[in-house]
């Protein structure tokens, strides 16, 4: 009996010490590395999708992808949500200025830390392609209406 109480007390201490270390996302959103993500299958052009994402949460934007691992996580979310549907999904990157040069920043203002362009793609508004399981970046005309992926910084699980 004493051992049972001691084990339960130990588990309780571990549970409380871990509390607050996880990110908390709203219902229907998925968390990865302190951020919340959601794939929306409603179709919007790039600018309207970015505006919509900004309305979803504090600091929300179309998803910026900072690493291959994050790209794989987002790709899996999109593939699961859009299995039998659209072939492209907007992310938070677009060309800026007169030329076809890509912006040096994502729509949330963060720097581009890695790139995963499909070969032969020029750079306009950027979408992920179903044919690459939503892993490779493709340019698309910004006025096309596509599904999109929003991202924002999660609230700590225990804001105290």
Curated annotation (Swiss-Prot):
One of its GO terms (cellular component) is extracellular region. Residues 1-23 form the signal peptide. PROSITE patterns: C_TYPE_LECTIN_2. It is found in: Secreted. It comes from the Eukaryota. Keywords: Disulfide bond, Hemostasis impairing toxin, Secreted, Signal, Toxin. InterPro entries: C-type_lectin-like (IPR001304), C-type_lectin-like/link_sf (IPR016186), C-type_lectin/snaclec_domain (IPR050111), CTDL_fold (IPR016187). GO terms for molecular function: toxin activity. Expressed by the venom gland. Residues 32-151 form the C-type lectin domain. Disulfide bonds join 25-36, 53-150, 125-142. Interferes with one step of hemostasis (modulation of platelet aggregation, or coagulation cascade, for example). Heterodimer of subunits A and B; disulfide-linked. Belongs to the snaclec family. This is Snaclec subunit A. The lineage of its organism: Eukaryota, Metazoa, Chordata, Craniata, Vertebrata.
């Amino acid at each position: 009996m004493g051992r049972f109480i001691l084990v339960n007390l130990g588990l309780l201490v571990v549970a409380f010490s871990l509390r607050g270390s996880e990110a908390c996302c709203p219902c229907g959103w998925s968390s990865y590395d302190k951020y919340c993500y959601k794939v929306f299958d409603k179709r919007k052009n790039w600018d309207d999708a970015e505006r919509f994402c900004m309305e979803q949460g504090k600091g929300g934007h179309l998803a910026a992808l900072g690493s291959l691992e994050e790209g794989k996580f987002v790709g899996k979310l999109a593939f699961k949500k859009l299995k039998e549907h659209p072939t492209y999904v907007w992310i938070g990157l677009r060309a800026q200025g007169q030329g076809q040069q890509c912006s040096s920043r994502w729509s949330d203002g963060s720097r581009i830390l890695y790139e995963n362009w499909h070969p032969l793609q020029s750079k306009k508004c950027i979408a992920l392609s179903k044919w690459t399981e939503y892993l490779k970046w493709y340019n698309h005309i910004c006025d096309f209406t596509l599904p999109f992926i929003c991202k924002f910084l999660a609230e700590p699980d225990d804001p105290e």
